[in-house]
Each structure stands twice: as structure tokens, then as C-alpha cells.
């Protein structure tokens, strides 16, 4: 089956535009995508980068550079995640604290998170999996109670809507997306 039949011509035209104008990085096409994606997600800014790992590394790096987090601080993260989520944390000298998933959704178990919070905890990284939103109001309440940053890994959940209408990538303090097809 021709999987490109529906959008093949449009994709070829877009690729041709990028290749023929010589701007493979940054440039007008990238700026337009960042603007359009920000509108789609409902955020002020989008920054294009190479991949989801880089996006997450840059988020944690920014918080370290700004002094919001420092090496040795902890980030609660679901045990059921792709390794990039963990690598982004450790790359910045932060310590991942694994939280077991809910057995019925395989997403971070919001009933276990608060028991993992310590004086060194600075953030919760949620991973929206299988097109489902991992965020719950309980997670938001925990972040508020302990003044924690909420980081979203949205590699598997572009455009999912929370019951309050917010879209994945606009729920937390920062979010990383990936367009890798695997």
C-alpha cells in the first residue's frame, strides 16, 4: 500500500523547497514550523532541534544554567520510558528517581509520586505514552505543593488534549517533542 498517496505530493514539494533554498537548518521553513507548532500546541515559543533527546537535554540544561536546578538534584521520572528521558536528566548531572507505572495505563503512577519527593527533588518529568496524557490534576497539585517544575516528554503524544482543553506540550513548564517515526 502506498502510505504517501494522501500527502506525497505535498511532502515532496516541502522537501524540495528546503533542499533548493539551501537552508537545512533554521531559515524560513523552520521559523514557520516553530510558529505553526506553537499555535497548534498553545505555547508562546517552540525551538526546533535535532531530536527528542536534544530537546529534553536543553530543557534540563536551561534549568541548570538558570540556577533552578543543580547537579545532584532529583527529577522524578516514570520507570516505563524511553532511555532518552533518563539520559537528558543524567547528562545534566541530575539524578533520576524512578516511579513505577500504573498497571492499567503504563504511565507514571500519580499515587506513588509524592512518596518519592525529597528535599532534593526539583522536578517531575512525565512521559505521555501511546497517545495518552500522563498528566493528572494530582500531579499538578504535587508540583504546586512542593514547588516542582513539570517537564513533559511528548514524543508519543502530539496534540492530545487534557479534559480542560490544554494540549500536550502546553501543560507543564517545558516540553520536548520528537517526530521520530519509531
Language model features: what each stretch is:
Residues 104-182:
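Active-site phosphate-binding strand-loop segment of PLP-dependent enzymes
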Residues 80-86:
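Conserved coil-to-alpha-helix start sites within the AMP-binding
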Residues 79, 98-102:
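Short beta->alpha connector loops at strand-helix junctions that form conserved
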Residues 23, 28-74, 88-92, 98-99:
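Phosphate-binding glycine-rich loop
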Residues 47, 76, 97, 150-151, ...:
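Structural detector of well-ordered beta-strand residues that form the stable sheet scaffold
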Residues 1-23, 28:
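N-terminal "arm"/small-domain region of PLP-dependent enzymes with the aminotransferase-like
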Residues 16, 20, 34-38, 60-61, ...:
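Solvent-exposed, non-membrane alpha-helical residues enriched in polar/charged side chains
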Amino acid at each position: 500500500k502506498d502510505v504517501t498517496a494522501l500527502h506525497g505530493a505535498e511532502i515532496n514539494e516541502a522537501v524540495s523547497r528546503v533542499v533548493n533554498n539551501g537552508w537545512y537548518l533554521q531559515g524560513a521553513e523552520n521559523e514557520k514550523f516553530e510558529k505553526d507548532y506553537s499555535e497548534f500546541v498553545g505555547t508562546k515559543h517552540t525551538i526546533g532541534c535535532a531530536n527528542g533527546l536534544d530537546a529534553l537535554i536543553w530543557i534540563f540544561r536551561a534549568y541548570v544554567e538558570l540556577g533552578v536546578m543543580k547537579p545532584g538534584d532529583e527529577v522524578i521520572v516514570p520507570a516505563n520510558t524511553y532511555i532518552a528521558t533518563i539520559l537528558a536528566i543524567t547528562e545534566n548531572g541530575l539524578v533520576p528517581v524512578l516511579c513505577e507505572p500504573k498497571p492499567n495505563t503504563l504511565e507514571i503512577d500519580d499515587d506513588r509520586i509524592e512518596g518519592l519527593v525529597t528535599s532534593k527533588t526539583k522536578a517531575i518529568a512525565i512521559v505521555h505514552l501511546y497517545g495518552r496524557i500522563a498528566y493528572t490534576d494530582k500531579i499538578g497539585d504535587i508540583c504546586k505543593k512542593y514547588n516542582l517544575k513539570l517537564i513533559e516528554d511528548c514524543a508519543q503524544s502530539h496534540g492530545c488534549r487534557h479534559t480542560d482543553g490544554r494540549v500536550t506540550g502546553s501543560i507543564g513548564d517545558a516540553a520536548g517533542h520528537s517526530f521520530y517515526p519509531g
